[in-house]
């Protein structure tokens, strides 16, 4: 897996009236051992869906807003837009709250941000740089309805003024939310995709000025679950061509195939009015349990880059962290390519590449052309640990299978440091007998792991990257572990799996071991393990 490098006071709006209560600590601060180093987290409070992602071309800064409750570590109203920024998509700096509701029983729900270069909204004059004409489009959720509202910023997205004639769309519904807006060059207008959540509709609207919207069409495909949320629609380039396809994203919760919440996507064409799928396939974005509410950055013309919420609504409110809860995934770059589903079928698939910038390599271990045996594992011997490690390996299945009725596996074990005379581990494995990868995050000493929805063991099928000259399957896997989250990228990102995990107090990832329970069945063609620091 290649690591992509991209070149990349409290002055509130007068409309953000409610006072944010001071955070009350309800338990031990776990920041030292399970706060991720490079995954965006709030300093205190609750975080969920990414909102309003945009790139400021004037300052070369990436902005991420998110659903935020500063008053507690669980979801609850009043709900705000928190705000963080980054110069490299790896290191994040928290800002003041950006948007807030009028009353304590209301919420500024999910939405997006656009740059109104041509001042179609009329909110700006020439004193505001064209690259910083920031307009937020969001769901205003009040007890009896959800409407789509807008607000504008005159200081590059730090503070916002709400439009006096809000709402801009009101369809008299309590389940109408999460607008994602973009400029459609071909028809010279703004496009909004927004969810009629419990009707399983993604509605497509058009506007010339961000204020007056016309309904164009409905998109109604996909795996249903309980409701649709957090849609998106964007052009994604096809690798090794000058072409692209439109991709529709949507999230479902609850009721995803793996339980709880997840993301799906569809590939097709968009003419400015209607999105039409190229095929009838519903594609899954991530095979893990902790990847939801995906959104792409606007106004980044070079690449398609996005973030997701790295949690699951089945257990997000009770994960053992304090004084914050939840993180984002790593930023990922997205392209499309044809990928083998089996030996006879290729389909167009999203390819996901993690973005890591400006990290120090503290320690590393390398191995090449190494045949694993039961008594000869490869293990790091790092004297220190930041809790931030990655591994990149290509391995080949060799020889004849010994027994198709028993496990014949290669495992990547992530061990904690020794603390209180014990260590803890999670593992990723490949079982030759069924040609599947599996993940095990079961840590018996942690009470939270008894939560029935925090699925500890699950698997996914991954087609080989390729076959060698002897017709033996070859697999690639890149993984990055950051205190309490593991992101896996199979076969150069053609499939991913994102999962959180929780070790005992004062334990965090320290060593990585590559092992097998059989002799001579797996050859490490290449292996690189690194300890990193931010």
UniProtKB/Swiss-Prot annotation:
Signal sequence bounds: 1-21
GO biological process: inulin catabolic process; raffinose catabolic process; sucrose catabolic process
Glycosylation, residue list: 71, 118-119, 172, 218, 375, 381, 392, 420
EC nos: 3.2.1.26
Gene Ontology CC: one annotated term: fungal-type vacuole
The organism's place on the tree of life at top rank: Eukaryota
One annotated GO molecular function: sucrose alpha-glucosidase activity
Keywords annotated in UniProt: Glycoprotein, Glycosidase, Hydrolase, Signal
Active site positions: 49
Any Pfam family matching the protein: Glyco_hydro_32C
Enzyme class: hydrolase
CDD domains: GH32_Inu-like (cd18622)
Binding site for substrate: 46-49, 67, 109-110, 177-178, 229, 313
Transmembrane found in the keyword field: no
Catalytic reactions on record: Hydrolysis of terminal non-reducing beta-D-fructofuranoside residues in beta-D-fructofuranosides
InterPro entries for this protein: ConA-like_dom_sf, Glyco_hydro_32, Glyco_hydro_32_AS, Glyco_hydro_32_C, Glyco_hydro_32_N, Glyco_hydro_beta-prop_sf
PANTHER family: EXOINULINASE INUD (AFU_ORTHOLOGUE AFUA_5G00480), INVERTASE 2
Family the entry assigns: Belongs to the glycosyl hydrolase 32 family.
Protein name according to UniProt: Invertase
Gene name of this polypeptide: INV
């Amino acid at each position: 897996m290649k690591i992509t490098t991209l070149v990349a006071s409290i002055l509130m709006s007068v409309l953000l009236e409610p006072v944010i209560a001071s955070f009350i600590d309800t338990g031990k601060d776990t920041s030292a051992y399970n706060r991720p180093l490079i995954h965006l987290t709030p300093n205190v409070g609750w975080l969920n869906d990414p909102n309003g992602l945009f790139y400021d071309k004037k300052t070369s800064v990436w902005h991420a807003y998110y659903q935020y409750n500063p008053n507690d570590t669980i979801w609850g109203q009043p709900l705000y837009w928190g705000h963080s920024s980054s110069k490299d998509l790896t290191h994040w700096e928290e800002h003041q709250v950006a948007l807030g509701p009028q009353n304590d029983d209301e919420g500024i729900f999910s939405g997006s941000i656009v740059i109104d270069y041509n001042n179609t909204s009329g909110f700006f004059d020439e004193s505001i740089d064209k690259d910083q004409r920031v307009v937020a489009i969001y769901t205003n959720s009040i007890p009896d309805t959800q409407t789509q509202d807008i607000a504008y910023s005159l200081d590059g997205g730090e503070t916002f003024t709400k439009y006096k004639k809000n709402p801009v769309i009101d369809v008299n519904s309590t389940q109408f939310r999460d607008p994602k807006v973009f400029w459609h060059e071909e028809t010279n207008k703004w496009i909004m995709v927004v969810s009629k959540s419990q009707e399983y509709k993604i509605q497509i609207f058009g506007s010339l000025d961000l204020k007056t919207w016309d309904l164009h069409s409905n998109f109604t495909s996909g795996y249903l679950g309980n409701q649709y949320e957090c849609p998106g629609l964007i052009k994604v380039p096809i690798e090794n061509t000058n072409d692209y396809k439109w991709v529709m994203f949507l999230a479902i919760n609850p009721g995803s195939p793996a339980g709880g919440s997840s993301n799906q996507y569809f590939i097709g064409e968009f003419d400015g009015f209607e999105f039409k799928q190229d095929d009838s396939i519903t594609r899954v974005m991530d095979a893990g349990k902790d990847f939801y509410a995906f959104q792409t950055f606007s106004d980044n013309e070079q690449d398609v880059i996005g973030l997701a919420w790295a949690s699951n609504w089945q257990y997000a409110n009770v994960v053992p962290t304090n004084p914050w809860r939840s993180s984002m995934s790593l930023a990922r770059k997205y392209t499309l390519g044809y990928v083998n589903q089996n030996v006879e079928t290729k389909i167009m698939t999203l390819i996901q590449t993690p973005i890591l910038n400006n990290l120090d390599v503290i320690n590393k271990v390398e191995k090449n052309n190494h045949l694993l045996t039961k008594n000869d594992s490869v293990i790091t011997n790092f004297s220190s640990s930041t809790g931030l490690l990655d591994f990149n390996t290509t391995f080949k299945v060799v020889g004849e299978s010994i027994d198709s009725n028993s496990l014949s596996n290669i495992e990547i074990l992530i061990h904690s440091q020794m603390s209180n005379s014990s260590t803890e581990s999670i593992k990723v494995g490949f079982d030759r007998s069924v040609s599947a990868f599996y993940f095990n995050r079961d840590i018996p000493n942690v009470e939270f792991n008894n939560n029935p929805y925090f699925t500890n063991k699950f698997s996914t099928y991954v087609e080989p990257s390729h076959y060698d000259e002897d017709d033996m399957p070859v697999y690639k896997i890149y993984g990055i572990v950051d205190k309490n989250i593991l992101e896996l990228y199979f076969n150069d990102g053609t499939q991913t799996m994102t999962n959180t995990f929780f070790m005992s107090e004062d334990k965090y990832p320290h060593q990585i071991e590559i092992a097998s329970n059989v002799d001579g069945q797996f050859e490490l063609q290449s292996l690189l393990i690194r300890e990193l620091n931010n």
